[in-house]
Amino acid sequence: MLFDQIASNKRRTWLLLIAFFGLLALLGAAIGYLWLRSAVGGVLLALIIGAIYAGVMIFQSTEVVMAMNGAREVSEQEAPELYHIVQDMAMVAQIPMPRVYIVEDPSPNAFATGSKPENAAVAATTGILQIMNREELEGVIGHEVSHIRNYDIRISTIAVALASAITMLSSLAGRMMWFGGGRRSSNDRDNDSGLGIILLIVSLIAIVLAPLAATLVQLAISRQREFLADASSVELTRNPQGMINALLKLDRSEPMEHHVDDASAALYISDPKKEGGLKKLFYTHPPISERVERLRHM
């Protein structure tokens, strides 16, 4: 059951990534059709822009992410229990030992960053070290180490980059339509044809709806990787109850006092903002109740 769930989550993630590239290509084709006189040219342009966005974001240093979240690196002497748990989980996962950081915040939480295991780091708040016992903390750190082993940070970064590229291209297309109009001219043979009108409408719909669709796909990818990391943590610790207890404590916690931007919020094991209302629809994390239910059925 455990390995079936892990395999299923991986398949869903790759299907969502394929959908992401398809969405980017569709938007590129729409822009190419309207302004470049070539749908293929638009697709190539969109893919190049997406690749540039992803490349820049992937190579953002671990130190920058940690600084943005107010984390400081600690030694084995400063935080022996946390350090040894990270060391143990990394050994079981067969990855290099990540660097260990602490965030001074009373709200329990943790996150990992790094585009590959060789430059990865794990951070935990002072709050999580105070309220969790060793089994629960092992579940949390196992979750973060699983993100590193599964290259989740890289996958999530690609998803964020593609969503950003799609939003930028859609905004650019909207401004071009507003200030300069489309490529429609008397020289286009398909201008007044039924096919031309259909293609025009489809292109406009793609440009308008692409950012929303990109956001939804990005959120779906993030949620699938959270389920996968939960299951992978149990694979490492062989203790689903420890992970369940940790999640239940996280569910009862208060929002973090330290300001967390939207990009960093997706890295944490539990949503650090805990905003309500309609914003719940755009959470990067699945509901903890659903995560717990899946763990109980392993």
From Swiss-Prot:
GO terms for molecular function: metalloendopeptidase activity; zinc ion binding. GO terms for cellular component: plasma membrane. It is a multi-pass membrane protein. It is found in: Cell membrane. Its main location: membrane. Its EC number is 3.4.24.-. Keywords: Cell membrane, Hydrolase, Membrane, Metal-binding, Metalloprotease, Protease, Transmembrane, Transmembrane helix, Zinc. Binds 1 zinc ion per subunit. The chain crosses the membrane at residues 14-34, 39-59, 158-178, 197-217. One of its GO terms (biological process) is proteolysis. Signal peptide: none annotated. Zn(2+) binds at residues 143, 147, 226. Its cofactor is Zn(2+). The active site is at residue 144. It is an enzyme of class 3 (hydrolase). NCBIfam families: PRK04897.1 (NF003425). Belongs to the peptidase M48B family. This is Protease HtpX homolog. It comes from Streptococcus sanguinis (strain SK36).
